[in-house]
Amino acid sequence: MIARTRQGDYAAFEALYNKYKGQVYRTALAIVRDQGAAEDILQDCFIKVYTHIDRIDSSLPLIPWLYRVTVNLSYNWVTRRKRWLTPLENVIDRLTTAPRTSPEQAVEEDELQRAVQEAIYSLNFEQRVVLILFYLSNFSIREIAYILDVPEGTVKSRLHYGRANLRQKLLGDRRLSIGVAYEWS
């Protein structure tokens, strides 16, 4: 698709956009917590694809490059607005997808969702981005390092400290039972 887009094939660019727009949008939304901003970032990302199409190495997968652009645009938006990462409802939904069998279980799951969301919100920006890319987007450490343009050791460190901070916050949350909290360790 990249080669065809380079040749001016608009349908190829449209196919490229349709293939990756959901992933780019979800990542931007998880970082910026604002639907309008996520939509703007999505558009800006694909404008960059179109304007830099000649610089993109078509022998490499496009998605890590797209995520790098998405994360950078999202980071710039957050920095300009002095906002923190937040929603991550997708992560929380993935963590609590078991069917509810009782009202008590439903209440416990709602409490767990709130506790996880608050714990994730309290992490610093760098740890949150790494956790989003690792758990929500399923990228490897090497891919995250490429996307963020940092050494793999930095990604491992942020992932380690992000998990540790998340675990500490969840274990210290009085709303969670010990049994539920230990599931996060």
Say what each PLM segment does.
Residues 4, 86, 90, 115-118, ...:
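C-terminal edge and immediately downstream basic/flexible tail or linker adjoining helix-turn-helix-like DNA-binding
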Residues 4-15, 25-44, 55, 152, ...:
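Short, charged helix-capping/linker segments at alpha-helix termini
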Residues 17-18, 29, 134-136, 160:
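Short amphipathic helical patch at the helix-1/turn junction of helix-turn-helix
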Residues 21, 25, 46, 124, ...:
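C-terminal flanking helix
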Residues 26, 40-47, 60-72:
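Structural recognition of an alpha-helix C-terminal capping motif at a helix-to-coil junction
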Residues 36, 117-154, 168:
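Helix-turn-helix DNA-binding module
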Residues 51-58, 68-89, 101, 109, ...:
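Arg/Lys-rich amphipathic alpha helix in sigma70-family domain 2
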Residues 84-113, 140, 183-185:
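Internal acidic/polar
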